[in-house]
Amino acid sequence: EAIAQSSGVNAEAAGYLAQVKARANMEGKDVSTIASELQRLGKQAFIEECWKERLREFPLEMKIWDDCVRTGKFPQISATNKGEVQFVDLIGAKNGSGATFKATDLYWPIPVNEIQRNPNLTQNEGYSAK
């Protein structure tokens, strides 16, 4: 993803992703075939393919939230089309429990000692100021 973000979709970026995809290759394709297919993708489609692969590779690693915050996108997995994922804007998206993400969900609490040192600071919404 980083290579594609900075240099566009090229052989290096496609090669790395192809190696990962080839390990669980269900279609019997070799790395060079997968890399060739990936190189034909546009930049955004390639980046989203990287995100999809992270979802498949690290489902229980709790990495998804960091990716959502970093990209501003949330993966919506289709309930009807197996394996289909769409990336929608994080703010306004609904999670699996039906809660809607708000901008304030992206804030961390301000440490209490910082608030004590600076009375002009107020705690971020959703956190109690002690």
Predicted feature locations:
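Long, intrinsically disordered, low-complexity segments
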Residues: K21, A35-K130
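Boundary/linker segments of alpha-helical solenoid repeat arrays
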Residues: E27-V31
